[in-house]
């Protein structure tokens, strides 16, 4: 069985690479009392964070776009499954049973995409260089889109029935008794 040479090479490299990372890092002992947590005692005492470069901004922008694309993919798949459910719902009684499955699948896609986006925003807010307000706006937009989808599917399935009653305006000119000009009986 040929081709196994790379496995041994990868295992050797992994052993060499991880040997250093499994050991605790050596801390330099410079100045100050042992175990002091006072400011000014440490390797980075008084150091300000490095300035943000154009490359860091570009990386943050790419990370945000990739994150938004992932959400939009899940949302698109949820809309597609819901659309198939709408078509199936109109076909027949058997189609109605299948439509509920498609609506459920669409809902799972929308909920999973929205939840993963919100959790990712909270976890990656620093690397994305987002302010708290920017992250809140992003999460709010995703929540609004998800609620809009849920309302649309609920209305379509009849769970949120809206009864609209048209009441004709009575201006006093029409007679309440007898047929109208076309010979139709009065509405009841």
UniProtKB/Swiss-Prot annotation:
Disulfide bonds: none annotated. The modification Phosphoserine is found at residue 48. It comes from the Eukaryota. Its main location: mitochondrion. InterPro entries: TMEM160. GO terms for cellular component: mitochondrial inner membrane; mitochondrion. Keywords: Membrane, Mitochondrion, Mitochondrion inner membrane, Phosphoprotein, Transit peptide, Transmembrane, Transmembrane helix. Residues 24-52, 168-188 are annotated as: Disordered. The keyword Repressor does not apply. It is a multi-pass membrane protein. It is found in: Mitochondrion inner membrane. The chain crosses the membrane at residues 102-122, 135-155. Residues 1-96 form a transit peptide. Belongs to the TMEM160 family. PANTHER family: TRANSMEMBRANE PROTEIN 160 (PTHR16236:SF0). This is Transmembrane protein 160. It comes from Homo sapiens (Human).
């Amino acid at each position: 069985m040929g081709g196994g040479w790379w496995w041994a090479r990868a295992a050797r490299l992994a052993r060499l690479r991880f040997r250093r990372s499994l050991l605790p890092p050596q801390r330099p002992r410079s100045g100050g009392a042992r175990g002091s947590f006072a400011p000014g005692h440490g390797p980075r005492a008084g150091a300000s964070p490095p300035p943000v470069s154009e490359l860091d901004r570009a990386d943050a922008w790419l990370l945000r776009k990739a994150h938004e694309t992932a959400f939009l993919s899940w949302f698109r798949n949820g809309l597609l499954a819901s659309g198939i459910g709408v078509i199936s719902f109109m076909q027949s009684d058997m189609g109605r049973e299948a439509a509920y499955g498609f609506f459920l699948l669409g809902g799972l896609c929308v909920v999973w995409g929205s939840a993963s986006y919100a959790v990712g925003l909270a976890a990656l807010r620093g690397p994305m260089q987002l302010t708290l307000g920017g992250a809140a706006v992003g999460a709010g937009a995703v929540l609004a889109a998800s609620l809009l989808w849920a309302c649309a599917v609920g209305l379509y399935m009849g769970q949120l029935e809206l009864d609209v009653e048209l009441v004709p305006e009575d201006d006093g000119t029409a007679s309440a008794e007898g047929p109208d000009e076309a010979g139709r009986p009065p509405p009841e």
